A protein has these predicted regions:
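Conserved, structured core segments of small domains
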Residues: 1-94
Length: 94
């Protein structure tokens, strides 16, 4: 599996983001259930969010976020980064 970091950048006012946040988080939960998402959360200050994922390809990650309610509502843009971890905590070995 490949490793990815996705930066979600808000392109709308906080009030608009808040209206869709619950749907967005429910959608992210499907990524957790599929074993794709390792962790996620808002940036501080809340100008967007970060998601750490694993997957087979960048295309798989793009496809996942194509259906994110934030994306479908036109509220965000996404930056995608693939990386190769060379060091990690022992508990992350597998």
């Amino acid at each position: 599996m490949k490793q990815f970091i996705i930066e979600i950048i808000y392109q709308a006012e906080p009030e608009e983001i808040a209206k869709v946040r619950d749907e967005h988080r429910k959608y992210l939960q499907t990524g957790y259930e599929k074993g794709l998402i390792l962790m996620s959360g808002p940036q501080v200050p809340q100008i967007g969010g970060l998601v750490v994922m694993k997957g087979n390809s960048m295309e798989e990650i793009h496809d996942f976020f194509a259906n994110d309610p934030y994306n479908l509502a036109g509220l965000t843009k996404y930056l995608y980064f693939e990386f190769e971890p060379v060091m990690h905590q022992e508990f992350m070995k597998n």
